[in-house]
Design a protein with these regions (language model features):
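A Zn2+-metalloprotease active-site environment signal
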Residues: 1-153
């Protein structure tokens, strides 16, 4: 739908605007702004490089540790670390967007409904601990819970 780049540039796919309301697009852009403001792209690159460096160091150690680090088990471990880090960043960017929308006097409902639309597209898909994004239905519920706590319908 959209993504943030390390240089602070945000890209939005035109298809997003066709399927979402203006309020939902505002929420998605706020989410991507969160990634930029919170330094997620750069931190993500650092984590990816760090996990790869650990894996290379383990491989150079040789023996069982070296063999495991070069196996599919090593691939899974690296992917798990990166995906869990990414899921945490997604949740932080969701909260950033929610707070930004509120500060600007814009309804955060578009954030919840954008996730609900994405959840419909994800129906039947099995989620995994290796996913780099939390499930959209869970993200929508988190926003709905925040709205309820803040007295927003």
């Amino acid at each position: 739908n959209a993504f943030a780049m390390a240089n602070g540039c945000i890209r939005v796919y035109s298809g997003l605007m066709d399927m979402m309301t203006d309020n939902e697009v505002e929420a998605v852009i706020g989410h991507e702004m969160g990634h930029v403001a919170l330094g997620h792209v750069k931190k993500g690159m650092q984590v990816a490089l760090g996990t790869n460096a650990v894996r290379v160091a383990a491989a150079s150690a040789g023996g069982i540790v070296g063999s495991l680090s070069q196996s599919q088990l090593g691939d899974l471990g690296e992917k798990l670390v990166n995906s869990q880090f990414s899921q945490r960043q997604e949740a932080e960017a969701d909260d950033y967007s929610y707070d930004l929308l509120r500060q600007r006097g814009i309804s955060p409902a578009g954030l919840a409904t954008s996730f609900e639309k994405l959840a419909k597209l994800e129906e039947g898909r099995q989620s995994s601990m290796f996913d780099d994004h939390p499930a959209s239905a869970e993200r929508a519920q988190h926003i709905r819970d925040r709205m309820s706590a803040d007295g927003i319908k």
